Amino acid sequence: MKDVYLYIVEKSVAWEFDSPEYGRLARKVAEMLYERKEDLTDDRIAILLNISTAETRRILQYLMRLNLVGVKKRTTEDYRIEYTWYVDDEIIKQAIGGRARTAREKISMLIRALTEGSYYICPNCHMRYSLDEAVNKGGVCPVCGAELEYVESLEEINKLTKVLQKLEKL
């Protein structure tokens, strides 16, 4: 499960910041927090990974918004507020469970839509159109001009149902 979690961290950050490098950096941060099994400040993480504190904070705050890292707030002896970050098995379980729940909901909606109507798809750009939309557009994709193809719903529903069953086991 740790590998799946690290993949989610890497891809989420890479997508948000439009930078595969940031994604790899976020993966290193999460991996280090998990392996050390202790709460660390953002300054300490930056020093251990030899990266800037600003980058570390940006990554950690984004991961916090996605509930991919845990954060604890405490007051120091000199009354400063200090945040410490951690990753444990519970965080990983919640992160993967949340992603699986979202995927299940979307797949269920897609299965429901496929059972309720007929669909056509463009072979080039893979846009999906309902029967009414395909008729209104004359059976031609408005994006690329290719002829729309009928989607065999039963086959697609079976594939999606198998994926849904696997996700429900998580």
Curated annotation (Swiss-Prot):
Transmembrane segments: none
PROSITE patterns: HTH_TFE_IIE
Keywords from the named record: DNA-binding, Transcription, Transcription regulation
Any one Pfam family match given in the protein's UniProt record, by short name: TFIIE_alpha
Gene3D superfamilies listed in its UniProt record: Winged helix-like DNA-binding domain superfamily/Winged helix DNA-binding domain (1.10.10.10)
GO molecular function: DNA binding
Domain named HTH TFE/IIEalpha-type: residues: 1-93
GO BP term, example: transcription initiation at RNA polymerase II promoter
Stated role: Transcription factor that plays a role in the activation of archaeal genes transcribed by RNA polymerase. Facilitates transcription initiation by enhancing TATA-box recognition by TATA-box-binding protein (Tbp), and transcription factor B (Tfb) and RNA polymerase recruitment. Not absolutely required for transcription in vitro, but particularly important in cases where Tbp or Tfb function is not optimal. It dynamically alters the nucleic acid-binding properties of RNA polymerases by stabilizing the initiation complex and destabilizing elongation complexes.
Family recorded in the similarity comment: Belongs to the TFE family.
Record remark on domains: The winged helix domain is involved in binding to DNA in the preinitiation complex.
Assembly behavior: Monomer. Interaction with RNA polymerase subunits RpoF and RpoE is necessary for Tfe stimulatory transcription activity. Able to interact with Tbp and RNA polymerase in the absence of DNA promoter. Interacts both with the preinitiation and elongation complexes.
Protein name: Transcription factor E
Organism per entry: Pyrobaculum aerophilum (strain ATCC 51768 / DSM 7523 / JCM 9630 / CIP 104966 / NBRC 100827 / IM2)
Lineage: Archaea, Thermoproteota, Thermoprotei, Thermoproteales, Thermoproteaceae
